[in-house]
């Protein structure tokens, strides 16, 4: 046949074949034999069912043409379907030629076939045909029973026994192919279950990564706000540091001035000590001179008094002599009178000088005594002030010692803080190394996963053509298996898609799941869109009604081949497993589902990998910014401590400067007062010397005149 016939043509040809065979059987036999009629009816029913099944396959292929992945395979499956159907027809009708089957007239479709059967899916069409299918099955059972009854009579027909043997061989072959198909379906379903469990694990890990990324984002926002606050504090601290630098410069200038003034104070103290010594020397000299002058004055006064007494005596004697001689000579009286007047005048003059000198000496003595008392009082006050200054100086030294101790304590605290910072840096380095090891483990896991995925895709691509060819063969050979399959059908057709649980690969998948869960190299993979992925995947898997786990995927291709060989051996050993003929359609749908799921899983995994890389980069950036912020915080804390120390030192220096300024002012006041006192004393001493010199000169002159 050059072209593939449609379902209507196949059904019409099947009805024609049945009519022709009925006519031939009635013409050859003299009496109508029920055995021949039953054989012809059986063959016509089988051919009609064969054509119906081929039509169903053609409809399924027409529906699958819309899928681009199946479009290329459908042509090959159609050709193989043609060849298999021709082979089955040749086996069933070895004595008839194919050219007799064609006729120009077209026969209408059977009444039990719905008119809009082309719009139905495979499952709906099977549900519609199933009652007629059961009826035909009953007819076939009745015919087979009659055939078995008549087979004892017609033992001479060798071609009939050959046909039965060939059909038995076909049944055995179809059973083997069905067992293989069940094994492949079971393997693929287990793989899909493994992939699904793996996807669920990945989604759980993605949710955990979303939570951790959200927490890291919150930490990052907090660090940013803290960083901005610290930047503001840093700006304020820099301004304060600038002010502190200016104040430090002013303090340095003040310290220089203080040092200069300290030097001046020491020099002035030395000069003051020298002046004190000179003052004491001059005071002692003054007292000695005073004593000498007092003694000299006393001597002079005594001498003057003696002289005055002598002059009185002489005057009395002279007066007596004058009175005695008054009578002698008048001229002599006049001369003596002049002499007496001159002597009395000198006497009065000397007496006045003596009284004035006494008054002067009394005033000088009083002034000197008052000055001496004042100087002694001032000296005592200066000594008291000196003691007070020394006490203040001692207190300042003690305060400086306490400040030095506090400075040492602050230095120790600073060294401890530096050690803590170093410990924190070491911890940060260890965390970085652990993060690097985790990233390396993740990269290794990613490479393993890529290898496993590539191996899985390769094996899927290898399994697809074999699966499609086996499906076509089974579909073309369904009529041979109808008797056995319909006897095993019970209840609803949808409940017969599953295989027995004792022959599944659950133990193998659980063992592989335990091995992969105990693998330490597996790390969680994170994603941001966990809820959307869960909803999409749950809808998809609920719609397709498929469970799978990625834990069943081995790490190497050799392990995968070993698992498949083990599965095939288990399936061959368990040849007595009852399987369902409706698994043909399920294999096709599962093939498309597995290909669709593999494509979707690959796209989802690529998206997850991209989001994982982005989240990893974000996490690395956050870690870098966190370390920078921590370093900045530590630096700002150190600068803040330094600034506080500088403020304390500034306050201490200001206090010391104020104290030194007050001391300088008091010392300068004392120096000024003492210099004034020294100048006054020098002036007084010079005045006394001049007065004493004048008095001595006057006394010398008076003595010269008296002589």
Swiss-Prot record:
The modification Phosphoserine is found at residues 151, 538, 549, 568, 571, 576, 589. It is found in: Golgi apparatus. Residues 122-473, 594-706 form a coiled coil. It comes from the Eukaryota. The modification N-acetylserine is found at residue 2. GO terms for cellular component: endoplasmic reticulum; Golgi apparatus. GO terms for molecular function: small GTPase binding. Residues 1-52 are annotated as: Disordered. Required for normal growth rate on galactose and mannose. Belongs to the SGM1 family. This is Protein SGM1. The lineage of its organism: Eukaryota, Fungi, Dikarya, Ascomycota, Saccharomycotina.
